UniProtKB/Swiss-Prot annotation:
Keywords: Amidation, Neuropeptide, Secreted. It comes from Praedatophasma maraisi. FMRFamides and FMRFamide-like peptides are neuropeptides. This is Extended FMRFamide-3. The modification Leucine amide is found at residue 9.
Length: 9
């Protein structure tokens, strides 16, 4: 979910 995009920082 959206949390994955955050982890890709």
């Amino acid at each position: 979910g959206p949390e994955t995009a955050f982890l890709r920082l």
